[in-house]
Amino acid sequence: MTIYNQAIESYNEKMAKDVIMLAGRILLESGAEGSRVEDTMTRIAITLGHKESNSFVTNTVINFMLHDESYPRMYRIRTRDTNLHRISRTNGISRRLALGDISLEDAFQELQKIYQEQSIK
């Protein structure tokens, strides 16, 4: 019989992953390079008290794990564009989180707005 370690996600962990993954997705789909996306995701995690997070980003996939006892998240990137405005706004939200100027929930709402906006062609 195999016994699996079943991690239970708290609301804060789920919200942290939601914010981190959405920020990563916006950045990568907007043309940011993978190492910059990983750096931003890691910085947000550290800001939220998760110093042992792991992220791995390629041109088509984002993988993220908050800590060893949490479920990993993976997202496949299907579209890419160049949108420096979206990158700048997403980085601004990351900075505001680091400074404590915005709550996790507000950051998620602002990131959702950025994500839902159409790219300017």
Question: Can you annotate each of these PLM segments?
Answer:
Residues 44-47, 113-117:
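A short structural micro-motif
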Residues 100-109, 113:
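N-terminal loops that bind phosphate or other acidic moieties
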Residues 119-121:
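Core alpha-helical transmembrane segments of integral membrane proteins
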